[in-house]
Amino acid sequence: MSDIDALQALTSQMTQEGIRRLLVISGDAAWCRKRAEAIRAALPGDWLWVAPDAPAQPCCTPQALQTLLGREFRHAIFDAWQGFDAAAFAALSGTLQAGSWLLLLMPPYETWESRPDTDSLRWSDCAQPIPTPQFAQHLKRTLSRDPQTLLWRQRQPFCWPSYPSRECWRPATGEPQPEQAAILSRLREMPPGVATVIAPRGRGKSALAGQFISRMAGTAIVTAPAKTATDILAAFAGERFCFMAPDALLASGARADWLVVDEAAAIPTPLLLQLVSRFPRILLTTTVQGYEGTGRGFLLKFCARFPQLHRFTLRQPVRWAPECPLENIVSEALIFDDEAFAQAPHGAIEISAFYQQAWVNTPALPRAVYQLLSGAHYRTSPLDLRRMMDAPGQHFLQATANNRVAGALWLVEEGGLSAELSQAVWCGFRRPRGNLVAQSLAAHGSDPLAATLVGRRVSRIAVHPARQREGIGQQLIACACMQAAQCDYLSVSFGYTPKLWRFWQRCGFVLVRMGNHREASSGCYTAMALLPLSDAGKRLAQQEHRRLRRDADILTQWNGEAIPLAALREQALNDEDWRELVGFAFAHRPLLTSLGCLHRLLQYSALPLPALRGRLEEKASDAELCARLRISGRKALLALQRAQAAQALIALDAGRTQSLRDVMPGGGDHAG
């Protein structure tokens, strides 16, 4: 039998059995593409090619793949030769029909550990691509253990294998499967309220929503992040399919008996809350699986708002057979299961550190930690797995009970920027990679040298549900403080809720910043807090906490959410205010960063300052102000607001203004 005959026979068998498979093609770039093109020519299908520079249609970049979720393809090629976008790879696997091949193009097998991976630029905070040896070895180990996955290496013999026959698969007929039928029955009888259907890919969520619409007695409107992702839902809903984009739906005032939101987790929470409040009955479908991190947030944060929530789960695959080899290998390679939650860890708690090398030496340990963190955090995705494995500057603590993981803490090194770079960040001229909290302390705080301090940021913390409320989280933080004794502070950035803030307070953190926008993933405002470890860290924490207290009333009015601390009602312009105001007027500090001191400036200035007063005192929108002041665009408006701030400062004290300009990076070169 020729190679093509063997390939076609194996593909026919896969179609009959309702499964998909992964073929890894490893070698020089040109050789890999040539093999992929030969297989593509031998098998009919869609053959979506995912690559930064795909040679054939249909194609898309890994970053654009998100827009195709909800669609189906027969066969696909994923080019990871330059860099492995694990989330896009997993998402692509979820779009493939039964009987499909997923071809994964990789560099020469022997170079995987040492070869720089361009995807690392997204998660390593490094200026250049870095090798990713832990992930490479993990992937090799996973592939070598799976006889259902094929590996074709350049200059190595390869033949298409034969596999024992499986049970013949009966594809879905369009009629509801047993799981779907049970949920449809419950939905038809549901009183006014919110229902969710959650499941991994391929379980028929979109089909279920379409079937429900086609069979319901009332009317329904469908919304989703993108209409292109509702193809399956539309096919099942038939002529009763009525789609409106989320923003258009809010603006329209349209009404219906049901609102059906497909892939609800991908819609920003504030927008989703507004939509939900408008309809008597709401059906939300979403994917809860590791490659779509916000799907977890949908469970952890959004769904928790509805105590009478009707929650349904689809477990049986509909679009392929159970135990599909492709689904299994993707789940194993990217650790999508949650075995860490299967058994409660009983016994005395021991806390210890572990390092990235553990992924090679004792992989079960970091795997269990990652599973725990994934289950507890709404943002965890394969990008975090790659960062955990190979990014520099990561620190890990585990709390174990009888060798089972009961808690985990993940910290990231931050700060230590040069004085010059920290000042440039404060001015708004530079935004170097990484350093989330350290940069924010400089860019949004009052101290131009804040980013020179050295800290460790809490990236993730989790405790097993069976061991919560025992103080394990606080023990982990206390241990982290001892390990970071040479640092100036520990920091944390989190979606603010009163409950979460109480935990960080108990750990010793001081609140230093509240953001101006709600997070898309949680619907909460971002809060930042410091736990000082050195004298310099204490001074910074006290200074920024006091600044937040001075700005508390203004931020509360602006955000519509109370700041959880005692406001200081000091209206005098102090030294920090003057420095910040000069930074806004003559550099590039953002307006929202400067809300407090700008409000205080307006109290002191007798000038009209219409661009500033219109925005800050009247809360007019940028569009309203541009029309009122006859200027075109936000850039021109911001330039005018800076110029008016400069005018007010000079009118109050021209000498002080000039002396502060002189000590800014670049001195007086920056125009107001």
Curated annotation (Swiss-Prot):
Binding positions for acetyl-CoA per the UniProt entry: 461-463, 468-474, 506
> Gene3D superfamilies from the xrefs?
3.40.50.11040, 3.40.630.30, P-loop containing nucleotide triphosphate hydrolases (3.40.50.300), tRNA(Met) cytidine acetyltransferase, tail domain (1.20.120.890)
What PROSITE patterns is this protein classified in? GNAT
Task: Please name the GO terms of the biological process aspect recorded for this protein, alphabetically.
Answer: rRNA acetylation involved in maturation of SSU-rRNA; tRNA acetylation; tRNA wobble cytosine modification
The record's annotation in InterPro entries points to: Acyl_CoA_acyltransferase, GNAT_dom, NAT10/TcmA_helicase, P-loop_NTPase, TmcA/NAT10/Kre33, TmcA_C_sf, TmcA_N, TmcA_tRNA_bind
Entry superkingdom: Bacteria
The alphabetized UniProt keywords are:
Acyltransferase, ATP-binding, Cytoplasm, Nucleotide-binding, RNA-binding, Transferase, tRNA processing, tRNA-binding
Q: Which CDD domains match?
A: NAT_SF
Locations listed in the record: Cytoplasm
Q: Which reaction(s) does its UniProt entry say it catalyses? A: cytidine(34) in elongator tRNA(Met) + acetyl-CoA + ATP + H2O = N(4)-acetylcytidine(34) in elongator tRNA(Met) + ADP + phosphate + CoA + H(+)
Task: Name any one GO molecular function.
Answer: 18S rRNA cytidine N-acetyltransferase activity
Record-linked PANTHER family: N-ACETYLTRANSFERASE 10, RNA CYTIDINE ACETYLTRANSFERASE
Which family does the UniProt entry place this protein in?
Belongs to the RNA cytidine acetyltransferase family. TmcA subfamily.
Which residues are connected by disulfide bridges in this protein? none
UniProt-annotated binding residues for ATP: 180, 202-211, 319
Q: Does the keyword Ion transport apply?
A: no
Q: Ranges for the N-acetyltransferase domain? A: 349-531
Q: What is this protein called?
A: tRNA(Met) cytidine acetyltransferase TmcA
EC annotation?
A: 2.3.1.193
List the Pfam families hit by this protein, alphabetically. Answer: GNAT_acetyltr_2 (PF13718), NAT10_TcmA_helicase (PF05127), TmcA_N (PF08351), tRNA_bind_3 (PF17176)
Q: What's its top-level EC category?
A: transferase
- GO cellular component annotations, sorted alphabetically? cytoplasm
Q: Which SUPFAM superfamilies match?
A: Acyl-CoA N-acyltransferases (Nat), P-loop containing nucleoside triphosphate hydrolases
